[in-house]
């Protein structure tokens, strides 16, 4: 009877250890560097400082307004890009 309790305890401890390792690996993946992304257009009211705040809220280090050249029917626009 005592050996079966010991075996169950060892199995439970092993399962908890494995699940903690899996959780730490999953958490490590979620905090890896995010790929660059571009968000809203930069305007007279939304410029580099606002863009930087916007990107920081999305867990990026910084954000800048970058000029995007559109296809011939479109004009060039400033876009807030995070990196």
Swiss-Prot record:
UniProt signal peptide: 1-24
Keyword terms of this UniProt record: Antimicrobial, Disulfide bond, Fungicide, Plant defense, Secreted, Signal
One BP annotation, GO: defense response to fungus
Gene Ontology CC entries for this record: extracellular region
Subcellular location: Secreted
Disulfide bonds: 38-82, 42-65, 51-80, 55-81
Main location group: secreted
UniProt key word Signal: yes
Keyword Signal on entry: yes
Entries under InterPro entries matching the protein: Defensin-like_dom (IPR056373)
Family statement: Belongs to the DEFL family.
Protein name, UniProt field: Putative defensin-like protein 67
Organism: Arabidopsis thaliana (Mouse-ear cress)
């Amino acid at each position: 009877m005592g050996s079966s309790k010991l075996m169950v305890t060892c199995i439970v401890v092993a399962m908890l250890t494995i699940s903690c390792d899996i959780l730490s690996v999953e958490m490590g993946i979620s905090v890896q560097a995010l790929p660059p992304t571009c968000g809203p257009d930069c305007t007279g009211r939304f410029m580099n400082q606002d863009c930087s705040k916007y990107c920081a809220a999305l867990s990026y280090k910084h954000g800048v307004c970058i000029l995007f050249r559109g296809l011939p029917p479109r004009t060039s626009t400033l876009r807030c890009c995070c990196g």
